[in-house]
Structures are given as C-alpha cells and as structure tokens.
Amino acid sequence: MMTPEFFMEIEKKTFSPYAQLTSASKGRERPEETSPVRTAYQRDRDRIIHSKSFRRLMHKTQVFLSPVDEHYRTRMTHTLEVTQIARIVARALRLNEDLTEAIALGHDLGHTPFGHAGEEALRTCYDPTFRHAKQSLRVVDRLENDGEGLNLTFEVRDGILNHSGKALAATLEGRIVKFADRIAYINSDIDDAIRGGILSLSDIPSDLLEILGEGYSERINRMVLSLVEGSTDKNEIVMTEPVGEATERLRAFLTDRVYINSAAKSEEHKAKDLLVSLYGYYIDRPDELPPLYRRIAEEDGIKTSVADFISCMTDRYAVDLFRRLFIPDVWRGGAV
C-alpha cells in the first residue's frame, strides 16, 4: 500500500528545492489523526470538493449574470479551469501539485452571487473592505461543516486568502494559483464576450494578439509557457517578457471593454439592489435566518451573519428569495 509516508519520500527526492513539502506543513489549527492513504494536502483537496460551497459554484455568476445559454462560464467551470492550469505549472516546476490543486479548488468558495456585482453590494451595505478572497477563507474556516469549518492546513488557507490582490502567498504553489486565476479568467472572459456579441477579436489591440496569439488555446499555451520559463529554478513565480506585460495590458483592456462598460453589465445595478434589499431585510429580522446563521449572529454579530448568508447564496436562490419576500404572490382564491 502506498502510504502518505511513501508519497512524502518521493517529494523529498523529486521536488524542486523551492517546493512546499507536505512533511514541512505548518499543520492544522485543530490536530487530527493522519490518514493511512492520503497526505494532508490531498485530504484538504477532498474536503473542498465534497463541500456544499464547492457544489454551489455551479450556480454562481462568472461574468454574465445568470445566462440562459449554458455554454457561458460559471464560478464552477472557472474554478476547474484555474485548477487545470495551476496543476500544469506546478508539475512543470516540480512544485507540490496536491497543494496547488487544493488552493485552486478553494480559491473562490466565498464568492458572492452575481459575481463582482455581489461583492460590491456587500461593500456598500456591510463592509467597504469586503473581499471574496477573505470570505473564501471564512467559508473554509467557519461556515462549512455546519459551522465547524474544514480545518484545512495553513498553506492551503494562506493560498486561498492571498490568491488575489497585492499580497503574496507564503508558498510558490499559492502564487501559481494567482497567475492561473488571471490566465483562466482573461481567456475565458474573452471567449464568453465574443460568444455574447460584446466583443470581437478585431477589437483586441493587434500587437497583443501578435504576442499572445489569436486563438483561445494558443493564448493560454503561451501564457503558461511564459510562466514556466520565467519561474524555472527560481524562488519566485513570474512571467517572461513580453508576454507578462502583454497579459497585463489585455487584462486592462477587458476591464474597460467588458467588466465595466459592456452591455453584460447593464443589469448589475439590479443585482446589487436585490442583495442590498435582502441584507436589510435580514438585519431587521434575524429570527428568520436559517439556524446556522442565527447561531453565527449570536457569536459574531448580526451584520457578519447576514453577510455570510448572502455570500453563500447562488444567483438563482437570491432571485427566488427576493421574489418570495418582496413580490406579491398571485391570489389563487375561488371565484365569487
């Protein structure tokens, strides 16, 4: 039988000197018995995959709000794309693929319904510093497993928290996920924007297409190769130039043309208003919260509890709940 000790010996013999060894993990906040067949990071990965928050990602917006066309990305498909890219890079660099996979699978667990519109709604009504990365950590630490949390290792928790923004993860594996996230959403969002008629390939600056490629697969391959070449035998994760600079310019282009000013964003104000209304409703009626969130309200405060409840909703659940709470139902009484 291949035991965790067997895998950890292989790590010591084959991994890069810059890799995070499983045997060197800082461990969990609550000590546990070890598994006879899985390493700590493999167990973290499995806990995330089997969590309710992970399953809900399939019904959360990536860019397009609740699209009718089922070919548009969701938070779930985005997460799987990030995971695939991150694993390729980690393997090529001889880093810890299990750790990388666990971070990638968990990085968006705390994302709100309606994508970044939901995040902005909670910044408005709850906390100006609300970030989905911080909420993702709260999900795995506090909300999952009926309020007990998943008790993940320090390195996975750190990678989830620091997958976005300026802060760097403590491990190279966590830093890979930050780049994989960008590579995935840049290219999938272009693909979805073209599908939705919001963007055409000719709209993208020609010099960027020349550097990065015109096709979806070509761009991903060039970005991944740039990341691997720039990071090989180094204690950092970086892209080579000119691909790195072109990637950032392409991201800025998408921010202006898709994320802020496109027709896909025309309904976002409704999504924000919907979530703000739900937040206000439950702030005034905490007794109507589900049992878990009533308990959290007693321990962490009502504002935090309501924000937790809302951030865990799917797009569909939020819309249905709003309709039930605020839209009068049709009278179905008998005829006079």
Regions found by a protein language model. Give the residues of each.
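Aspartate-rich (DDxxD/NDxxD/DxxxD) Mg2+/diphosphate-binding motifs
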Residues: 98-125
